[in-house]
């Protein structure tokens, strides 16, 4: 459960990302593919080389979906319902991958924000990304 303070911190971080979402998304995906190479199996048609148009484009989609979640912190299930359906029924992505992506996003945020990525922000974002991962995995049950 996200507290009012968590929500405030999440919104602050998201506001700071304005203008660099595509870069953050691409870096997150690239980090995931490097750190967890098994995740590449879901992208057989992608050029997985660093900075490819496909990685940048999908990274932008990932960050846009998270932006939707940030705007709907009180109703994540409804906000992410279509995305949950897509990943569960069409793409059949193993839900563990949502957590792997979340870990990679945390690292990218920390490298971009450096000292501004406080333990409080890390904790709030961890709760947020865990909630998003749980919602995306709901349809698997």
Swiss-Prot record:
InterPro entries: Globin (IPR000971), Globin-like_sf (IPR009050), Globin/Proto (IPR012292), Hemoglobin_a-typ (IPR002338), Hemoglobin_oxygen_transport (IPR050056). Heme b binds at residues 58, 87. Transmembrane segments: none annotated. GO terms for cellular component: blood microparticle; haptoglobin-hemoglobin complex; hemoglobin complex. It comes from the Eukaryota. It holds the Pfam family Globin. SUPFAM superfamilies: Globin-like (SSF46458). One of its GO terms (biological process) is hydrogen peroxide catabolic process. Residues 1-141 form the Globin domain. Keywords: Heme, Iron, Metal-binding, Oxygen transport, Transport. The keyword Transferase does not apply. PROSITE patterns: GLOBIN. The keyword Ligase does not apply. Heterotetramer of two alpha-D chains and two beta chains. This is Hemoglobin subunit alpha-D. It comes from Apus apus (Common swift).
């Amino acid at each position: 459960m996200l507290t009012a303070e968590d929500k405030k911190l999440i919104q602050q971080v998201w506001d700071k990302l304005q203008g660099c979402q595509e870069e953050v998304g691409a870096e997150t995906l690239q980090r995931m593919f490097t750190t967890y190479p098994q995740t590449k199996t879901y992208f057989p048609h992608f050029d997985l080389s660093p900075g490819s148009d496909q990685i940048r484009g999908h990274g932008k989609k990932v960050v846009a979906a998270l932006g939707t979640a940030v705007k709907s912190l009180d109703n994540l299930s409804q906000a992410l319902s279509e995305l949950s359906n897509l990943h569960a029924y069409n793409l059949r992505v193993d839900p563990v991958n949502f957590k792997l992506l979340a870990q990679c996003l945390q690292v990218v945020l920390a490298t971009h924000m450096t000292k501004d990525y406080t333990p409080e922000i890390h904790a709030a974002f961890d709760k947020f990304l865990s909630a998003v991962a749980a919602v995306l995995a709901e349809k698997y049950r």
